[in-house]
Amino acid sequence: MKITKIEKKKRLYLIELDNDESLYVTEDTIVRFMLSKDKVLDNDQLEDMKHFAQLSYGKNLALYFLSFQQRSNKQVADYLRKHEIEEHIIADIITQLQEEQWIDDTKLADTYIRQNQLNGDKGPQVLKQKLLQKGIASHDIDPILSQTDFSQLAQKVSQKLFDKYQEKLPPKALKDKITQALLTKGFSYDLAKHSLNHLNFDQDNQEIEDLLDKELDKQYRKLSRKYDGYTLKQKLYQALYRKGYNIDDINCKLRNYL
């Protein structure tokens, strides 16, 4: 087969053959196979050229994708599939990128976990889930997590939550709020509980009473639209109890409030 036309199209070259076949190739392909108009290719040469062209094109796509941030093997492979690169070509590209250290799932997991230690607020369980979603295997994640101390991060997150809710909740509710938030963020129950030891939950009676008054007013405005009488009183009691207020304090307030 003879090449009848070579035309540059942005980043690729259009090649037309005398059998009416056409294909797009990279500049690397042009150079490697010394392609030019009127060059004759046999079937083996043509197949080699097609394979290299897709390999070169796919690798360029992958490098572009990697130029924005670190990616996992799976993320790169999925990206190439979206661009219709053949599976056996994808496997070759991934191997090359690994050998050239463009992609490394273990390093990606390590970087992700270290960045979270500096700027994030996630515990090990959530971190593992996020890394698994990126296609990184457990055996690349678990050793790094096991060597990482999350106690200081848990304390930092708990302090931030404490500062946010201290003037809104009584001690018991505040402890429950912080503990639940830490569990949701992926910290263990033991680590969440331990982080509470560094916080001062002491509130004087007047502070607690003021919080109770505010919460009672808030719940009354909400519930009195639907309920009255004994039902309203029960609903108020339940709402305040769920917020962590003392039973005796609630009963005393409700007797004087209604």
Swiss-Prot record:
GO BP terms, alphabetized: regulation of DNA repair
InterPro entries reported for this sequence: RecX_HTH_1st (IPR053926), RecX_HTH_2nd (IPR053924), RecX_HTH_3rd (IPR053925), Regulatory_RecX (IPR003783), WH-like_DNA-bd_sf (IPR036388)
Lineage: Bacteria, Bacillati, Bacillota, Bacilli, Lactobacillales
Gene3D superfamilies xrefs: Winged helix-like DNA-binding domain superfamily/Winged helix DNA-binding domain
Alphabetical UniProt keywords: Cytoplasm
Subcellular location field: Cytoplasm
Family: Belongs to the RecX family.
Function: Modulates RecA activity.
Cystine pairings recorded for this chain: none
GO cellular component: cytoplasm
Keyword Cytoplasm: yes
UniProt keyword annotation of S-adenosyl-L-methionine present: no
A Pfam family hit: RecX_HTH2
Name of the protein described by the UniProt record: Regulatory protein RecX
Native organism: Streptococcus pyogenes serotype M49 (strain NZ131)
HAMAP family membership: RecX
